[in-house]
From Swiss-Prot:
GO terms for biological process: translation. Belongs to the amidase family. GatA subfamily. The keyword Transmembrane helix does not apply. Pfam families: Amidase. Keywords: ATP-binding, Ligase, Nucleotide-binding, Protein biosynthesis. This is Glutamyl-tRNA(Gln) amidotransferase subunit A.
């Protein structure tokens, strides 16, 4: 039995009683990484000082009242870590070592969590399969011939494989929830502005959000308790009071009303996924909830609007990578050639594709036809979702239309690859929270149930997800 088979609350008790040490937890993590990461490829950088840090924390653990004290965590490699390489899985930043921690990392360290290392991802968070990493693909612990999802593939795979207790990811169009679904773990994308983006390498600033990936809903709530809250270093950080999310966990679902959008169960949803989601809906009903089918017509435009908006913001954000200020610098004779060659050699194909799309959408003569129209669709979607939340407590449906696909299967078909995020993208465009929770297996591969909430109503999502998890059995460990 692994120590990580216990949740945060139980491990905290064991640490307080001296039955387990922080060093034991770190050893568990490193042993598991050594045993499995050649297969999985989840980590890009490991913390060389982890055991030394753990030894200093061993005695303090008995006195700490913070449930995260001594807990090993993995951090997605687009979240900066002081003194530890942050590459965004790109050769452009292959040797970049930040001088400060992201706010979320600082808050976790203040709580006593210990960073084990940096997790693999799609380059600059652009991808749905984690095949776009410049260094190596991440493989799904349930079947190493399949993708773990993206872009937070390393974050999901590391938790599913038992390499760390929990991890941080980022979600721009589903990059926490889709990998969570594919790997059979819990992934929360919080309300935009609830968690500071300071120290997150920007992809699309109006869509990006950091969130936790864990084995259980309870552990997820503990993690969000720590990282949520206003940050003066982030101009988009919301000034809202952060509740204790664990307080919502043991409430039942009696009298709650959920909406099931017909668009989320339309053609394109794999039969095995549909079957598990229909079972999940029956489980929610048995717990006292009412579920009604609704229509959110604007979601049919979500995919097109998202790729125009996200790519437009990316073309602006990634302009800073020029070979001059930091990162890769190509050898060249002129300044223009430095810019050109550095970006040509430093960026992968998917990053170049999105930069070109975004630059085109923002160019003279096309701005109104593409970018402006996409923003109008975004406004329409916000109105449509607001109408649903006037009558319903949450929205439910599949996290992804299929289970994890084979490595290499969709690399030559970007449009099919993009469609994997069709259920998750609307949440980012609207800015509301959503959680993916394991909903069973289809042909031996995990299926995720997505629960979507209103602005800053993460407590309701945890309430629903926890009740469903307890009834459905929750996390299952893949056999590696």
């Amino acid at each position: 039995m692994s120590l990580f088979d216990h949740g945060v609350a139980k491990l905290h008790t064991l640490l307080k009683e001296g039955e387990v040490t922080v060093t034991d937890l770190v050893k568990e993590s490193f042993d598991r990484i050594e045993a499995t990461d050649d297969q999985i490829g989840a980590f890009l950088t490991l913390n060389e000082d982890a055991f030394e840090q753990a030894k200093r924390m061993d005695e303090l653990a008995k006195m700490s009242d913070n449930p995260l004290f001594g807990m090993p965590i993995g951090v997605k490699d687009n979240i900066v870590t002081k003194g530890m390489r942050t590459t965004c899985a790109s050769t452009f930043l292959e040797n970049f070592v930040p001088a400060h921690d992201a706010t979320v990392v600082e808050r976790l360290h203040d709580a006593g969590a210990l960073t084990i290392g940096k997790l693999n991802m799609d380059e600059f968070a652009m991808g749905s399969s984690n095949e776009n990493s410049a260094f190596k693909p991440v493989r799904n612990p349930w079947d190493p011939t399949r993708v773990p999802g993206g872009s937070s593939g390393g974050s999901a795979a590391s938790v599913a494989a038992g390499q760390v207790l929990f991890s941080l990811g980022s979600d721009t169009g589903g990059s926490i929830r889709q990998p969570a679904a594919y790997c059979g773990v819990v992934g929360m994308k919080p309300t935009y502005g609830l968690v500071s983006r300071f120290g997150l390498v920007a992809f699309a600033s109006s869509l990006d959000q950091i969130g936790p990936l864990t084995r259980t809903v309870e552990d997820n709530a503990y993690l969000l308790n720590t990282i949520a809250g206003h940050c003066d270093m982030d101009s988009t950080s919301a000034e809202v009071e952060v509740p204790d999310y664990t307080a919502a966990l043991n409430q039942d679902l009696t009298g709650m009303k959920f909406a099931l959008p017909e668009e989320f169960m339309a053609e394109g949803v794999a039969p095995g996924v549909r079957e598990q989601i229909e079972k999940a809906i029956e489980t929610l009903k048995s717990l006292g909830a009412t579920i009604e089918t609704v229509s959110i017509p604007s979601v049919k435009y979500a995919l097109s609007a998202y790729y125009l908006l996200a790519s437009s913001e990316a073309s602006s954000n990634l302009a800073r990578f020029d070979g001059i200020r930091y990162g890769r610098r190509a050898e060249a004779d002129t300044l223009d050639e430095v810019f050109t060659y550095s970006r040509e050699q430093g960026f992968g194909d998917e990053v170049k594709r999105r930069i070109m799309l975004g630059t085109y959408a923002l160019s003279s003569g096309y701005y109104d036809a593409f970018y402006k129209k996409a923003q109008q669709v975004r406004t329409l979607m916000k109105q449509d979702f607001a109408k649903v939340f006037e009558e319903y407590d949450a929205i439910v449906g599949p996290t992804a239309p299929t289970t994890a696909f084979k490595l290499g299967e969709q690399l030559d078909d970007p449009l099919t690859m993009y469609a994997n995020d069709i259920m998750t993208i609307p949440v980012n465009l609207v800015g509301i929270p959503a959680i993916s929770v394991p909903a069973g297996l289809s042909e031996g591969l995990p299926v995720g149930l997505q629960i979507i909430g209103n602005y800053f109503d993460e407590s309701t999502l945890y309430r629903v997800a926890h009740a469903f998890e307890q009834a459905n059995g929750g996390f299952k460990m893949p056999q590696l």
